[in-house]
């Protein structure tokens, strides 16, 4: 990690924002430290809710692994609004940390997983169909508070209803989605985009294996281990990702990074699971040159602000 005094040599200072559980960043993000230093950029990990931090002392504040925000979203968004050099910007964070953004993207023509939104206090009963469904809160990180239920199983039907009641009692909006079985064979494809001289540009893609094996177990870890492999994006996936990014409020030129998570729909065509603009793992360790491209994206944003 770089010391504060290095900035006196005129190096731009960059905060890489994390949480108390990962004070030295996620290992994948650490891969960008050497490329940043090689560009004369003094970067250091900083915990987002550390009251001692002077955010104005940084030339750029880059969200990376503040993965404890889901149960404190209002506090997190309020903090983001106090950091003028934040990327991605605070209004993007406010929009993207509530998954109801998916309804907006769907209305704009982006293919998404069909979703039922259950407001707190609403009376929800499992649908009559007997397929598998995923239940999760609209504000969540990773697979926390997320479960997969087979509605042909009476016990699962009751567990699903209890899951929704539990989230509702906590004042949380719930998402109910059909489980798309192609995930079991194809996994989820994440397409990573990083800022370049001409705006956001495709960098690389990875495949995430399925993680949801059954009902919500109340797992308390910050994030579950995933099986990750490098993957080449298909033209159809790239097209869907670009269509998704084209309808982001405020445009994509001000974004430093974006991750578009796709799975095959019932007809095999890609559908959007999530658009990650807040704190996505960027998986730079899975693609040649990706740590350098991330450092270059930071340098691009610094140059715009100088």
Model-derived segments and their meaning:
Residues 2-18, 80-84, 90-186, 235-238, ...:
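Active-site nucleotide/adenylate-binding loops and adjacent lid/helix of ATP-dependent enzymes
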Residues 27, 147-149, 285-288:
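Short, solvent-exposed loop/turn segments at secondary-structure boundaries
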Residues 58-63, 136, 189-193, 268-281:
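A short beta-strand motif that forms the metal-chelation/ATP-contact edge
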Residues 66, 138, 179-180, 192, ...:
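Anionic group-transfer/hydrolysis microenvironments
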Residues 156-250, 271:
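Phosphate-binding site of ATP-dependent enzymes
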């Amino acid at each position: 990690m770089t010391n504060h005094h290095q900035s006196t040599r005129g190096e731009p200072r960059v905060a890489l924002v994390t949480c108390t559980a990962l004070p030295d960043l996620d290992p994948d993000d650490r891969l960008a430290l050497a490329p940043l230093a090689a560009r004369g950029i003094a970067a250091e990990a900083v915990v987002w809710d550390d009251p001692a931090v002077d955010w104005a002392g940084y030339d750029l504040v880059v969200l990376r692994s503040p993965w404890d925000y889901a149960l404190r979203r209002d506090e997190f968004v309020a903090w983001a609004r106090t950091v003028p050099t934040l990327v991605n910007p605070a209004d993007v964070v406010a929009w993207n940390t509530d998954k109801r953004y998916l309804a907006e993207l769907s209305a704009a023509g982006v293919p998404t997983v069909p979703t039922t939104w259950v407001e707190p206090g609403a009376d929800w009963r499992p649908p009559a169909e007997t397929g598998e469904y995923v239940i999760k809160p609209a504000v969540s990180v990773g697979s926390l508070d997320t479960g997969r239920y087979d509605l042909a199983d009476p016990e699962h039907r009751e567990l699903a209803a209890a899951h929704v009641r539990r989230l509702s009692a906590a004042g949380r909006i719930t998402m109910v989605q059909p489980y798309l079985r192609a995930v079991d064979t194809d996994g989820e494809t994440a397409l990573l985009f990083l800022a370049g001289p001409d705006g956001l540009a495709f960098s690389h893609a990875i495949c995430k294996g399925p993680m949801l094996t059954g009902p919500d177990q109340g797992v308390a870890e910050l994030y579950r281990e995933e099986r990750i492999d490098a993957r080449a994006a298909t033209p159809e996936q790239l097209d869907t990702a670009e269509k998704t990014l084209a309808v982001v409020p405020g445009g994509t030129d001000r974004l430093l990074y974006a991750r578009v998570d796709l799975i095959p729909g019932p007809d095999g065509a890609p559908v959007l699971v999530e658009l990650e603009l807040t704190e996505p793992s960027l998986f730079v360790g899975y693609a040649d040159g990706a740590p350098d491209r991330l450092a270059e994206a930071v340098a691009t944003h610094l140059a715009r602000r100088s």
